[in-house]
Amino acid sequence: MTRYPDLYVLRHGETQWNREGIFQGVHDSPLTTMGREQAAHQGKILNRVISDWSTVDIYSSPQGRAKTTAEIALAGVNRTADLHAALREVDTGDWAGLHISDIIDADFRMAKPYTVEWLSAYFSSPNGEGYEVFKTRLLEFLRSLQKPTVIVTHGMVGFVLRGLYLGLTFEQMAGQVGGQGVVFHLSDGREIVLKD
C-alpha cells in the first residue's frame, strides 16, 4: 500500500441545500447556522490535534461552502487554505439542483445510502462525472502531498479520498462513515474520526 502523509479531512458544514435534501454537486448554497457552528467545532478539533501549524499544508475546494468552512475553522490560526480544483465536489450532472426524492425516482439505487449500489449510482448520473475520472484527479492530488495536510472539501470527495488513502476497493468504500462537524484523521493507513 502506498504511504501518504497524515491527512485531516473536513467535509464542509451543513448548507441550506443539505438541509432541504437537494443535490449540490458543482452548484453551491450557503452554510446554515448549524453549518457555521460545525465549522467552528472542526476548528477546535484541529487546534487540539495540531500543535504547530507551520508543519502542515492546508487545501480547500474552491467552492463557496468549503471555502467558508475553511475560513471559519481556521479563524485565529493566522493561516488560510490554498484553493485546489481537484477538491471540488463530483459533478452530479443532471442531478445537481434536484431533490433526493426526484433522484430516487430516476435511479432507485440512490435510496440505499452507503451501499455499493448507491455508490455506483452516484457515479452514473446523467451527464455527470464518472468514477475513473474522479478517482484520477483525487489520486493525482493525494500523490502530490509532501507533509501533513488539512483538507476542507465535500462529502463524496472526502469519501473517495479517504478510501484511496486507506487502500480500499470501490466496494469497500461504500461502507465508510460520513459526517459534518467532524475531522477524519488518516495516519499510517488507518482512520480515526475526531468528534470532540
PLM features: residue spans?
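Phosphate-handling substructures
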Residues: 75-137, 195
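Short hydrophobic/aromatic-enriched beta-strand-loop microsegments
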Residues: 30, 77-85, 169-177
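A glycine-biased structural micro-motif
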Residues: 55, 97-100, 105, 147, ...
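Domain-level recognition of soluble alpha/beta enzyme cores
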Residues: 166-195
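Short glycine/proline-enriched coil/turn segments at helix->beta-strand junctions
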Residues: 74-80, 143-149, 188-190
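Short, well-ordered beta-to-alpha junction loops that form the rim of enzyme active sites
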Residues: 13, 61-63, 86, 153-156, ...
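Active-site-proximal alpha-helix that buttresses catalytic centers in soluble enzyme cores
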Residues: 5, 11-79, 129
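Generic beta-sheet signal
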Residues: 7, 56, 144-156
